[in-house]
């Protein structure tokens, strides 16, 4: 049972038994190379063990990037668009606390996948990120590793949510089991972060 094997790998990690966790994760990946949870368990096991393969699997310098989204059709500037998007997203934040069984702590999250939203500014967001996604995929290229091997002919967005953090809010470590590329778009940030003078957040 795949779920039981994943749970066992996580249990070995919790006990600090990296070799046992790595063996299970590698077995799961041999059966399903797109198993995100197994890949995350393997990366964690290699990191705990000090295995040099961790640096190849999690090549932050090559795989992490910063991009500015495009101005979608219908808006005269990115600033104008982001102002409208911020207002539209704020209307969707109807909850008063973070959702249970999610990674958010100290804030709210939209309960609806933004792909289902009907506000023009929200639907335009997916147009605005197409260019950066294509640029990112081109930059990382293809290769035999677990990540680049999936950089094939196309992509599609599976889900998107808006998070609004309160002071001292944060995310706990988590995995996106269905997503190959994960990203965050900062629509609005506090002045202390936006001015670039410190490393708050």
Question: Where are each of the predicted segments found?
Answer:
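Catalytic core of non-heme Fe(II) oxygenases with the double-stranded beta-helix
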Residues: 120-130, 134-201
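Short coil turns that delineate tetratricopeptide repeat
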Residues: 1, 30-34
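Non-heme Fe(II)/2-oxoglutarate
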Residues: 56-148
